[in-house]
């Protein structure tokens, strides 16, 4: 199939399409104008440190640091950062291969900044009809591997996904790591950081069952939980801090998503108002209990920051929520509220 025809099909699929961006680094060879995934036989992944920084502006910063070991002679390998096409955004596919919701992409190899090229790639889909083929944006670079240890560091920013019942979603591909020689990550660390904000999120525990998430900075709580409509998850509340998961000999058998907790409780009318809260623009209060809504709307921003309420009924109300983490030293100030929180304050008057 010619590349021009591939792009024409992609336009049909993606048009009318929420922002979903998945990513990891993989190995490719070039076939015409296309990049084709391949298996690397000499180079293994010794270490990966993957860090997400979540903000209230709707963006996530991603920092990935790898240590690779090349058991063979020096060689140049084409590596690629993969990101799926946006879904339900109405964006046409970009023939230049630049993803519309990724920016600030950088890559360093053994301390040297590398240039990269952009491509649209069709992953292997042998059983999918032509009209339903899916496409991937790839940021590709030539990595000059020397024999022995090599280090790769890349960063980028992308707009987080969201939905009717999701304030934010951060999907990520881990499975491309299986294309390297050892078919595992010898030493893997996942960090999720929320500087100067609070985030309440969860990750399905299937992939992460071999270890526990730990709060290593700031204020936070972690527990295993299963909501009425959810699989078993790691439920995490984090304020101005970082949570970490670490595993050796990690086999990434699946991909994962960092989901805001409202994805499991957003449509449950039995859940109290305020059971989920986020400071970002896509947080919505579902007015199932209008009698208390104004008090809750007005005070949610301060509860998020740990305010200890003088009104006993309010204090008792917020104490029922896992995300509420009291801080007796916190003194509220209206100038610290996000634009969305200022609107909540006005709604609660």
Explain the meaning of each model-derived region.
Residues 1-8:
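Bacterial N-terminal signal peptides that target proteins for export
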Residues 8-17:
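Bacterial N-terminal signal peptides
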Residues 105-169, 233-255:
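A surface-exposed beta-strand-loop module
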Residues 248, 264-349:
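Post-signal-peptide mature chains of secreted/extracellular proteins
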